[in-house]
Amino acid sequence: SVKSTIANNLKVKIAFEKLNESKETIEVAIGKKLPTVTGTISGTYSNSDTTSAAGVSTTPETFTDKYKISITQNLYDGGEKNLEIERSKIIYENAVINFYKTVQDLSLKAVEGYLTVINYEKSLESSEKNFDSVSRFLEEVKLKYELGSATITELKNAESAFSIAETNLFSAEQNYKVSLKTFESIVGKEAINLEDYVNVEDNLNFENIISEVYKNNFNILIAQNNIKIKELDLSKEKSSNRPTLDITASTEYSDGSRIDAGSENTNASIGLTLTIPIFQQNIDKSDIRKINSQILQTEIELEDLKDNLNIEVSNYYKNYLVSKSNLNTSLLTIEYANTLLESTQEEYNLGTKSITDLIEAETNLLNVNVEYFNANKNYLINYFNLLALDGSLIKLFEEYLPSYN
């Protein structure tokens, strides 16, 4: 299901195409270091008559065709092209990170959808068991009432409990059906057993998580790369003040003998051009100051991002611990509710407990089971959100990622 999600989701497809687009930026940057080759073909027809006191003179008709090839190669540009290649590689790296981030966000959404399905599935199972038990109790009370061994109050209480159980069952069925449709719309397939696929680590350490977040969080990696890009922009701007050296070679062939007798010419030339920036209206200095300001902004944004992530991790970790504690409490509560139901059933058989007591014990078991499923869902959602923040959630689904090399 994860593979289907990644393969078919439109956001993933867009991120993958942006990755391909940024790959072409590297090709363009490398291509700028190659020579420029141009070819020129021209044709000129000429014919003239001149009238003077001496009479009329006519220049023979000629059609001259020329063929010229020029090659220009930069020999030195202050390192600007190399800087642009390095810059384009970092932009591509950001595209890869953004692709991973898109897949991870989608995987997290799929996980949450899966947990919702499982939660409603378990709630439905408990509601079905509760409905069966209450139905059985109602039939038993009806029989006893007909025999005169049960009161009208007990009968009405059993009917009320049946009505509530019936409503709970209908609600659980609808919730489960809707969750299946929602999950299938996200993933494209039915839910699998996530806990069979993922080995959930029971003890997460806050300091370790924060350390991994600062090293591997996708937003932090992108922000760090943005600083590098701005620093390269600054180096490129400074290199624009340096001289550049280009070499140009050309060869030309012309034939002017197509109509009347003419001539053929072949020319070749080679030259060096040294360009020295002297004054650029202070635009370069202004751009340097602007880029320095942008570098400072991206550095501040990175620190602000770290602070926000620290708060986000703290909240998820707190919720993780609370949900873990609630999960353990729910297990103990279920154990107690099962024991209470068994005890109440025995006492009911002995006549020391009423049908009302038995229905209450059965309903209580349903409620604590539902609470457990909710606690388990919250526990796993907090767990996977922590994995997403430190960038490790994507590792669970790496085998489903398309190749981008």
Language model: regions and residue ranges:
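Bacterial Sec-pathway N-terminal export signals of envelope proteins
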Residues: 1-38, 187-231, 306, 313, ...
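Acidic, low-complexity, intrinsically disordered peripheral segments
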Residues: 1-2, 371-405
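Small/polar (Gly/Ser/Thr/Ala-rich) solvent-exposed segments
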Residues: 13, 36-62, 72-101, 221, ...
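Short, charged, amphipathic alpha-helical segments
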Residues: 86-89, 152-163, 292, 355-364
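Periplasmic alpha-helical coiled-coil/stalk elements that build and connect Gram-negative outer-membrane
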Residues: 97, 102-216, 316-319, 323, ...
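Alpha-helical heptad-repeat coiled-coil segments that mediate oligomerization/polymerization in large
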Residues: 151, 309, 316, 351-354
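C-terminal structural cap/anchor segments
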Residues: 287-336
